[in-house]
């Protein structure tokens, strides 16, 4: 019954996926992708045509001047660190106008003291929280922008917060407001979990840089590692010098044997993201009917692939994650347990029986072991797998007496 009710929404998701599929295809054809581009290089990686062509494809998809798409970028957090730290200098200030960013950013910024943080380089940080209703505190943002404000970081996805994920349209409104006050400020969007969810990306509404991970949406489940930064030419140049070395920049960086997976994963990404979106909507609909608070709720529009469900107890959180793990194609026999994961301020439990370690476009669930014991569910390389994962999570909760089935 739930799936029948969702038919109209699923049709709309398919329409967006088709649009984005053709957008990716068009960029690949425009840049004349050939078989030779699928092979990698070794050593320094000079004249890596596959790498350079893929970066032009990303720039076309995101409608930017340039892009950096590299296996040497380890994860989303690393991509953000490269983008931010390369475009700031001592005495500059970083501003987050959408509240506190994801936990792993704390140590980059120096919110939690850490070796090599921006704070150690005399780069200050200011933050303006969202208003209680989830809207932007425009007055607070106006006051926070000063002569030192050099870069603004806007996290699209909610992360581990209970705030709404931002639509591309809302991000555009925020960027316009900021640029009207200080046109030269660099606006960067953490695009993790948001790629291909809408027909447009934040770089099409004024973002100077969009940043993400290839083991999330744009890798399509095939990229074994990597990250991307797409944006203004000068910003990307700075990022490339930080990732490699001053004087080297984008010219070096061997792709070994990942090019084929990067290309093929990108080609599949719009349909993979569509399946993950359907899974998230299905999760909200079944868990809401079972009496749990879901963010976003069953009816709300989606701007990323993450579904948060407030389970209320540690037992519920653990049971949910055990169900997701049991539904995995890899390591389905393993039992996830909470642990002190680097970069987080509380124990975290993670379930991911994935082909790529830590891949969150594959069926996965995680959450910090603290009030309100919310689990964050995302991914599923196919909609059918996402659906099965959700049903397994309900089964495990039912077995523990934490879920009533009407």
What is the meaning of each model-derived region?
Residues 1-7, 14, 24-30, 34-37, ...:
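Conserved PLP-enzyme active-site core in the AAT-like
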Residues 17-21:
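Acidic, PIN/NYN-like endoribonuclease modules and their adjacent C-terminal/linker elements
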Residues 38-68:
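Active-site-flanking structural segment that lines cofactor/substrate pockets
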Residues 60-64, 114-123, 329-330:
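Short helix-loop-beta junction
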Residues 66-69, 92-95, 150-151, 184-187, ...:
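Structural motif
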Residues 288-405:
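Conserved C-terminal alpha-helix-loop-beta "cap" of PLP-dependent enzymes
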């Amino acid at each position: 019954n739930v799936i029948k009710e969702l038919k109209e929404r699923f049709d709309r998701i398919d329409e967006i996926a088709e649009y984005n599929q053709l957008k990716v295809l068009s960029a690949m054809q425009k840049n004349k992708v050939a078989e030779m581009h699928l092979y990698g290089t070794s050593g320094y990686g000079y004249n890596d045509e596959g790498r350079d062509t893929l970066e032009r494809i990303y720039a076309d998809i995101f409608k930017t001047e340039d892009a950096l798409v590299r296996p040497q970028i380890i994860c989303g957090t690393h991509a953000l660190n490269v983008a931010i730290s390369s475009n700031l200098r001592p005495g500059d200030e970083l501003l987050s106008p959408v509240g506190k960013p994801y936990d792993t950013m704390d140590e980059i910024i120096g919110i939690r003291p850490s070796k090599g943080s921006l704070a150690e380089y005399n780069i200050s940080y200011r933050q303006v929280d969202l208003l209680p209703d989830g809207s932007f505190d425009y007055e607070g943002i106006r006051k926070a922008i000063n002569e030192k404000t050099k870069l603004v970081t806007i996290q699209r996805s909610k992360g581990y917060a209970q705030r709404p994920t931002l639509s591309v349209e809302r991000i555009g409104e925020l960027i316009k407001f900021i640029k009207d006050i200080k046109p030269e400020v660099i606006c960067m969007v953490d695009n993790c979990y948001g790629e291909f969810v809408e027909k447009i990306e934040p770089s099409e509404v004024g973002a100077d840089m969009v940043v993400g991970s290839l083991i999330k949406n744009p890798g399509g489940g095939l990229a074994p590692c990597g990250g991307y930064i797409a944006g203004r030419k000068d910003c990307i140049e700075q990022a490339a010098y930080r990732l490699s070395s001053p004087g080297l920049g984008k010219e070096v960086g061997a792709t070994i044997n990942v090019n084929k997976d990067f290309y093929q994963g990108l080609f599949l990404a719009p349909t993979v993201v569509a399946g993950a979106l359907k899974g998230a909507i299905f999760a909200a609909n079944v868990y809401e009917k079972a009496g749990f608070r879901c963010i976003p709720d069953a009816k709300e529009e989606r701007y990323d692939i993450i579904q948060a469900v407030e389970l209320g107890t540690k037992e519920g959180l653990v049971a949910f994650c055990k169900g997701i793990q049991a539904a995995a194609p890899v390591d389905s026999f393993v039992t996830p347990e909470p642990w002190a994961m680097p970069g987080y301020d509380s124990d975290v439990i993670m379930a991911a029986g994935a082909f790529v370690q830590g891949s969150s476009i594959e069926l996965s669930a995680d959450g910090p072991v603290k009030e309100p014991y919310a689990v964050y569910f995302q991914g599923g390389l196919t909609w059918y797998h996402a659906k099965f994962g959700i049903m397994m999570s309900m089964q495990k909760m039912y077995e523990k007496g934490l879920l009533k089935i009407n």
